[in-house]
Swiss-Prot record:
Ranges for domain TRAM: 5-67
Organism name: Stenotrophomonas maltophilia (strain K279a)
Name of the protein in its database record: 23S rRNA (uracil(1939)-C(5))-methyltransferase RlmD
Gene Ontology molecular function, alphabetical: 4 iron, 4 sulfur cluster binding; iron ion binding; RNA binding; rRNA (uridine-C5-)-methyltransferase activity
Residues where [4Fe-4S] cluster binds: C80, C86, C89, C168
Keywords, comma-separated and alphabetical: 4Fe-4S, Iron, Iron-sulfur, Metal-binding, Methyltransferase, rRNA processing, S-adenosyl-L-methionine, Transferase
Gene Ontology BP, a term: rRNA base methylation
Role played: Catalyzes the formation of 5-methyl-uridine at position 1939 (m5U1939) in 23S rRNA.
Keyword Iron-sulfur: yes
EC number annotated for this UniProt entry: 2.1.1.190
Length: 444
């Protein structure tokens, strides 16, 4: 729903916060407004705050906290100086132990409200390090004439603006401590107005910055980027258009990979490939998913939305055969190369758009014992409706959006005769409202 700013009353008002929304904002019902819901950024349940309206719509309003009059015992001082402006982290004011409690509650609420299901068991949440964990991301870049400087950072809570960051504490230190240096450097370039974004990604061997540029770089700027990369330990790639235009600045680049030591697996990838952003929690998640799947050494497992083989190749160490299916043909090519690299001949990979009809494809007609899937935010309903689901003794569903998981869980339980054995949250993105989760289904 479109938000209106034309009728905003910026007079601060006092309100009590009743709950925490799925996106990390406090939920209030304003007296004198007919109990209309207001989402208040920077506020926690149980608090009384002074707030200022920032947006209005027919069904709800939005506001930001101006002053906390009565603080929650769960409130802590945010570690980052940019909290409240940058939208990268919205939960830093909530005690870390309570952040995952809130995410667990969001998951269970979605399962019940959207899917009309309840897990037989609530899994203990999966947690890891909460600072310096993010190894992949995208910084927006914008030259702001009024400030006479170039801003580098994530979007502000008002997404029209780029946050003016000096550092980022959730990004790995190799990058997070150098945001200000990156901003100062870009300001010195001839083409400082022609760089809209920079993607970063780190493997075990190197940290890569991929610089999106709208105009060809001058010779001076190319030399400057080379010197900046050498000074700060970055490998620089350039992107003039789509993904196919990404090229190393020096013409050679660097091999990128990360090891999954518990399974003696190494996954190679390219600078714009999808990898899980939190390396240590990724290992915990793989171990957790495999334990929940209970793979047998003589079983065949189907792994949907498999990417580079993040789950597929560790699974190949445990089962007779595993088949991975992924929509991105480039990732499938890398997954096949990774299988060869790791000597795993029992892993097959297929490229397929899993939102389209796949019932005539060879992999769909193969028989499997178990299913693991890790779909995007939109979920997996299209492919679930095509699969011969009764063949799967157990399904493990890894989700990055509790709403789509809940919808798909409702389909599996209420229409296909599965039981939701267990479900729980995983804190892949500490200090954000992002809810990663895992659920286990069995045939009734």
């Amino acid at each position: 729903m479109a938000r209106s700013r034309s009728r905003i009353d910026r007079t601060p008002f006092q309100t009590e916060i009743l709950d925490l929304s799925h996106d990390g904002r406090g939920v209030a019902r304003r007296e004198g407004e007919g109990g209309k819901v207001t989402f208040v950024s920077g506020a926690l349940p149980g608090e009384v705050v002074m707030a200022e309206q920032t947006a209005r719509s027919r069904h709800f309003d939005e506001a930001r906290t101006v002053e906390v009059l009565q603080a929650s015992p769960q409130r802590v001082t945010p570690k980052c100086p940019h909290f409240g402006t940058c939208a990268g982290c919205v939960l830093q004011h909530l005690d870390e132990d309570q952040q995952i409690v809130a995410k667990q509650r969001v998951l269970m609420d979605n399962l019940e409200r959207i899917g009309h299901v309840k897990p037989g068991k609530v899994l203990a949440p999966l947690v890891g390090e909460s600072w310096g964990y993010r190894r992949k991301g995208r910084f927006s870049v914008r030259r702001v004439e009024k400030k006479d400087k170039t801003l580098v950072g994530f979007r502000e809570q008002d997404p029209r603006f780029v946050a003016d960051l000096s550092q980022c504490l959730t990004v790995i230190p190799e990058i997070g401590t150098k945001v200000e240096a990156l901003s100062t450097f870009i300001e010195s370039l001839d083409g400082k107005r022609d760089i809209p974004q920079i993607e970063f990604i780190a493997g075990d061997q190197a940290v890569v910055l991929t610089v999106r540029h709208l105009q060809p770089l001058s010779d001076a700027d190319r030399a400057a980027w080379a010197a900046f990369g050498q000074q700060h330990g970055f490998v620089i790639y350039l992107q003039s258009g789509g993904v196919d235009t990404v090229q190393p600045l020096d013409g050679q680049g660097v091999p990128l990979s990360f090891r999954l030591a518990p399974w003696d697996v190494e996954l190679a990838f390219r600078p714009l490939d999808f990898i899980q952003v939190n390396a240590k929690l990724n290992e915990k998640m793989i171990a957790h998913a495999l334990d929940l799947l209970e793979p047998g050494e003589d079983e065949r497992v189907l792994d949907l939305f498999c990417g580079l083989g993040n789950f597929t190749l560790p699974l190949a160490r445990r089962v007779r055969e595993v088949v991975g299916v992924e929509g991105d043909a480039g990732l499938v090519a890398r997954a096949r190369e990774n299988a060869v690299r790791n000597g795993l001949a029992n892993a097959q990979f297929f490229s397929a758009d899993l939102t389209q009809d796949q019932r005539s494809t060879p992999w769909m007609r193969q028989g499997f014992d178990k299913l693991l899937l890790d779909p995007p935010r939109s979920g997996a309903i299209e492919v679930l409706q095509q699969l011969p689901l009764k063949q799967f003794k157990r399904i493990v569903y890894v989700s990055c959006h509790p709403g789509s998981l809940a919808r798909d869980a409702g389909y599996l339980v209420n229409e296909q005769g599965f039981t939701l054995v267990s479900a729980g949250a995983m804190d892949m993105f500490p200090h954000t409202a992002h809810v990663e989760s895992i659920a286990v289904f069995e045939k009734r």
